[in-house]
Amino acid sequence: MGHTAHNKTKLLNRVKRIRGQVEGLERGLDEGRDCGEVLQLIAAVRGAVNGLMAEVIEEHLREHVASPDLASDERARGADDIAGILRTYLK
């Protein structure tokens, strides 16, 4: 079982909180809130997404790169996977 399946409930709860924050941002824009409030809402969404990403990355590194049970080619593949994902995420 993969680490995302193992932590499914915890990760889904984070996603639901992010959804709520995005809905709050949408309401703020729809209601014409001032730019400072909108920026604060955007920062909250960004922080929540970054937190989710960090949690999944950490577990990926533990399971697919740092696990002592992995062969060196499996570790290299895990490191390559995460490097590509980080490149895409940080664009």
Model region roles, listed by residue range:
Residues 1-91:
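Solvent-exposed interaction patches of small proteins and small membrane subunits
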